Amino acid sequence: MRYRYIFWDFNGTIIDDVRNSLGCVNDLLDRKNRPHITLDDYYNYVETPIIGFYRHILPPEEINFDEISKAFHEDYGKRIVNTRLADGAYELMHSLKEQGVHQYIVTSNHIDEVTDLVKRFGIYDCVEKILGADNTLSESKTQRAKELFDSLNINRNDAVFIGDTLHDLETANTLGIDYILVEYGHQGKKLLRSFGAYTVADLKGVEKILYDERRVDFHTHSTRSDGTMTPAELVQHAKNVGLSAFALTDHDSVDGIEEAQNEAEKIGVEFIPGIEFSAAEDTEIHIIGLYIDPRNEKLLKTINKLKGSRKRRMEDICRKLRSLGFEITHDEALLIGGGHFVGRAHIAKLIVQKGYCNTVQECFDKYIGLGKPAYSEKNELTATEAVESIRAAGGLAFLAHPHQTKYNLNQLEELLLKLKAVGLNGLEGYYSEYTPEHIADYRLLAQKLKLAFSGGSDFHGAMKPHIAMGTGKGNLNIPYYVLDNIKDIKSSQNS
């Protein structure tokens, strides 16, 4: 079992009441001599707070929300006898209880109404707490969920929110936990997926994810950039640490992909060819490419352009370090990189070897990090060019570790909108060094801009010994459904 704590939405998730709600809405429209809406209309219009839904179907002068809400709940109460549990809900919730999984219901509906239904359907003993509204307004569900989550003091990797709407996705993102959205609820598959969300058809799909302990990592490096494992060693390490799939995303290089692909086929690890482009706006930007064609002409042209730029930049860093009194040469750093590649991490390792600093991180913090005295700007590739090169190679493009830029959330949103216009698919929603605030901020931003998210450890081997492949600092656990979502996006992109 992947999760130990499950937060359930109620309406449209545990109970299948969409047609009841649609009937109530059309009864209201009858009373106002307005045409009925269809189920597709309902899927497209439902939102939270619910008053937004009525703005889609009624003119402003006919919206008296207190009156509408009272009438809806009276009509819904009459239809309660027709409400039923979603297929498989009883069996799944009881099975989870038997396995010691903690289950909670968080709903926008009145708590008494929900409690009565939960008892009626025989699942009351499965849940430890029901959190609902104490009036008829559909609001504050997310806040109730957050207060409960914070009070439990649990690991985010152990929790999941199961729901059926974008509001449920927002709640999960606010908590910084995984989500599962069902397609039979109050918002359809088309709308949910347009926001980059992954959906399943029914509770059998939910159960499959709950029991699927496969893990993935979309951000790793080999000796073909600044990692310390060869591509083949990296594949073997992925298998050893229990990953089902991973991406090799060397900096500005595809040189290790063929070796990694061959090894992955031999030992049965699912491999994703990737790259991490280093680019510049008014700050340093990294763009991850997944499922790229490493032979693509435009991609290779961009990489060749960067090779010359990288060498000039590393030589400039070495010159600046020498001006600070360090005896450092580019050729020495190249030896550290195994003769393939020189990055700042290799220079930092050389500095440590020569006794100028105690750790690689100290080198970055004092000398070669952004804004430090030996830092050298990148100016050969824009983020737009990076995204365009990835997309030209048939890949998907994701903004890597946005917290490492100097952007605040508003500036980050502007960047993402700009890059989305040229093909950006998403950003990293999982990362080894994210705080809980980072997780919530970036996932909510992805949802707002209809972007998907990837994620990864940023594993470098001994170059970053505190970062483990697949688990980061012990805080990373990327479920396989994230890869399923990326595959679906890839398939849609190709069709």
Question: PLM ranges: what are they?
Answer:
Residues 78-105, 111, 115, 142, ...:
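Short, acidic loop-to-helix structural element flanking the phosphoryl-transfer center
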Residues 89-119, 131-133, 247-249, 396-403:
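Substrate-recognition element of Asp-dependent hydrolases with the DxDx(T/V) motif
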Residues 55-94, 101, 364-378:
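Metal-dependent phosphoesterase signature
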Residues 160-200:
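Acidic, Mg2+-coordinating phosphoryl-transfer loop and its flanking beta/alpha structural elements
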Residues 263-417, 476-485, 489-493:
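Extended substrate/RNA-proximal surfaces in nucleic-acid metabolism proteins
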Residues 211-284, 368-369, 381, 387-388, ...:
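An N-terminally biased module of ancient metal coordination in phosphate/nucleic-acid-related enzymes
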Residues 2-5, 141-169:
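Conserved Lys-Pro-Asp/Glu-containing loop-to-beta segment of HAD-superfamily phosphomonoesterases
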Residues 1-44, 58, 247:
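Active-site neighborhood of HAD-like aspartate-dependent phosphohydrolases
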